[in-house]
A protein has these predicted regions:
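Active-site-proximal helix-loop elements at catalytic-domain edges
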Residues: 1-29
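A short glycine/serine-rich beta->alpha loop
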Residues: 5-12, 42-51, 122-130
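Short cysteine clusters
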Residues: 17, 53, 101
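Phosphate-handling active-site elements
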Residues: 28-38, 65-87
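Active-site nucleophile and cofactor-binding loops and adjacent substrate-binding regions
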Residues: 36, 51-55
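DPxDG-like acidic metal-binding loop motif
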Residues: 58-66
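C-terminal binding/interaction regions
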Residues: 82-134
Length: 134
């Protein structure tokens, strides 16, 4: 199964977008599925505030684990992680128009009305999986 397929599969199990992306890469990141699910659990729905999309924060966690700064003196790691962060976020915004959850979904998911809009328009089941699969 590809990473995209894994992420969509996790998301279809009612996991947060951030959990789905991070768990799809758990093996490559040297963490367990449980660790990935726990680490990503507070980042879904733009950290439950409609802010940065959980698929983006999940991807940033993956990039941090793969390329991140390993110590205070690891300036190369810091520079590399900054570079891959900017590259990923810029590409996501270019492809999707934004990396803000509320902007992507076209509503305020923190409100009852916004959440209802997403459910009624199948955004969580049809639109969000597209974010998972990049």
């Amino acid at each position: 199964m590809t990473h995209k397929e894994k992420a969509v599969n996790y998301f279809s199990q009612k996991l947060h977008c951030s959990q789905a992306v991070l768990a799809a890469f758990a093996d490559e990141c040297g963490i367990t599925e449980e660790e990935a699910l726990r680490l990503g659990s507070c980042f879904g729905g733009g950290m439950r505030k409609g802010e940065v999309c959980g698929a983006v924060t999940g991807a940033l966690m993956v990039l941090g684990l793969l390329y991140g700064q390993k110590s205070a003196g690891d300036t190369e790691g810091r520079q590399l992680s900054n570079k891959v962060n900017d590259l990923m976020m810029d590409r996501f915004k270019e492809k999707c128009g934004s990396y803000i959850c509320n902007d992507l979904l076209g509503c305020d998911i923190t409100s009852a009305e916004g959440h209802k809009y997403c459910v009624n328009n199948k955004l969580f089941t049809e639109f969000c999986p597209k974010m998972e699969s990049g």
